[in-house]
Curated annotation (Swiss-Prot):
Involved in translocation of long-chain fatty acids across the outer membrane. FadL may form a specific channel. The keyword Amino-acid biosynthesis does not apply. Residues 1-25 form the signal peptide. This is Long-chain fatty acid transport protein. Gene3D superfamilies: Outer membrane protein transport protein (OMPP1/FadL/TodX). It comes from Salmonella typhi. Pfam families: Toluene_X. It is found in: Cell outer membrane. GO terms for molecular function: long-chain fatty acid transporting porin activity.
Length: 435
């Protein structure tokens, strides 16, 4: 396999990790920006203004706040993703708990300037992914470690035109850091079985040999906007938009395979003997639209709902280049647009207690033929519940919990065939304070 193909495999893994959005929503795009939202399956987020976290979804909601308001917390993700299968070498491909637990923090602040203007800021994570396999895993050439961490800094402002209409605009700065590692697994055995003449060479490739390592980091920038229409104090509707984010991702590649192996033209990544090479790829994270509604149908009851649409069809190909500008890889991906639908209800028990629940469905944007075990994406169903306790008119705490279940899917990757099924529990808490 050529050096071109070697970097291609690593670049592909990083690219898919970064652009596959919402770690525990379809496509692995993170939704977890607040704990109150978690408790209602993030339904109606563009139209609800019960804490500062909603402003990160719709900046027009800034006009709903009459005091500076702060919110901070985190969501704990406890996934259970398992892989099963058998390699052509007869070695098992079974692996349990390939996705580690994770914390997703969030911080939000909203401040009105006057009756018409206000501003807000937030720190969240909109993208994230982590899968880990043992170094000696038989499918290590497609498994290994895939780790993506992001931080989104948002600064926004809003303007109230009249009692009914408000408009908001925000700026996003996204920092992304990724690491990809791949190991030989049973590739040596497969090569020897296909061509016995190469058995002596293939036998030198141990299962835990690191055949690819890539890491890098970069900033990307985008914007978001929102419109809020208040029919009256009990009924409001929202339209929100988040732009593409272009990330010129820079990375370093290395392989621990000895360079001498290259002359045998084995079907493995090109060896660099541990030396590092540079490369880059440009990713355009897809835009997202969302329509939300909130209706207080009774003094103590409200319903809320959302329909989100992500333009994943904008991701039709993946192209990696060297620092010299040569095309290293170009592949048609053909992702499809995906949607998310959510419905929830809130019960305002008294001045201290609020209870909420919600359900949601996440449509996967990844076609079946493009699934991988490093990103075993699938459609997901949410079931959520949560509560808020207000200590007084200034301070409150949110608690939310969600259970997500993904359908069982088949994955064909390289010489391997897998089956994957995943579920996850999410627990969140936020503290809110109005000054």
């Amino acid at each position: 396999m050529s050096q071109k193909t070697l970097f291609t495999k690593s670049a592909l893994a990083v690219a898919v990790a970064i652009i596959s959005t919402q770690a525990w929503s379809a496509g692995f795009q993170l939704n977890e920006f607040s704990s109150s939202g978690l408790g209602r399956a993030y339904s109606g987020e563009g139209a609800i203004a019960d804490d500062a976290g909603n402003v990160s979804r719709n900046p027009a909601l800034i006009t709903m706040f009459d005091r500076p308001t702060f919110s901070a917390g985190a969501v704990y993700i406890d996934p259970d993703v398992n892989i099963s299968g058998t390699s052509p070498s007869r070695r098992t491909l079974d692996a349990d708990n390939i996705a580690p637990t994770a914390w997703v923090p969030n911080v939000h602040f909203v401040a009105p300037i006057n009756d018409q203007f206000g501003w807000g800021a937030s720190i969240t994570s909109n993208y994230g992914l982590a899968t880990e396999f043992n170094d000696t895993y038989a499918g290590g050439s497609v498994g290994g470690t895939t780790d993506l961490e992001t931080m989104n800094l948002n600064l926004s402002g809003a303007y109230r035109l009249n009692e009914a209409w408000s408009f908001g605009l925000g700026f996003d700065a996204v920092y992304a850091r990724a690491k990809i590692e791949r190991f030989a697994g049973d590739l040596g055995q497969l090569v020897a079985a296909q061509n016995p003449a190469l058995a002596p060479v293939a036998g030198q490739i141990l299962s835990d040999t690191k055949i690819a390592h890539l890491n890098g980091n970069q900033w990307g920038f985008g914007w978001n906007a929102g419109i809020l229409y208040e029919l009256d104090k009990n009924n409001r509707y929202a339209l929100t938009y988040r732009s593409e984010v272009k990330i010129d991702f820079k990375g370093n590649y290395s392989s621990d395979l000895p360079i001498a192996i290259n002359r045998f033209n084995l079907p493995i990544p090109t060896a660099t003997g541990g030396a590092t090479q540079s490369g880059y790829l440009t990713l355009n994270l897809p835009e997202m639209w969302e329509v939300s509604g909130y209706n207080r149908v009774a003094p103590q009851w409200a319903i809320h709902y959302s329909l989100a649409y992500t333009s994943w069809s904008q991701f039709q190909e993946l192209k990696a280049k060297s620092t010299a500008g040569d095309t290293l890889f170009e592949k048609h991906e053909g992702f499809k647009d995906a949607y998310r639908i959510a419905l929830g209800t809130t019960y305002y028990y008294d001045d201290n207690w609020t209870f909420r629940t919600g359900i949601a469905f996440d449509d996967s944007p990844v076609p079946a033929q493009n699934r991988s075990i490093s990103i075993p994406d699938q459609d997901r169903f949410w079931l959520s519940a949560g509560t808020t306790y207000a200590f007084n008119k200034d301070a409150s705490v949110d608690v939310g919990v969600s259970y997500m279940h993904g359908q069982s899917v088949k994955i064909n990757e390289g010489p391997y065939q897998f089956e994957s099924e995943g579920k996850a529990w999410l627990f969140g808490t936020n503290f809110n304070y109005a000054f």
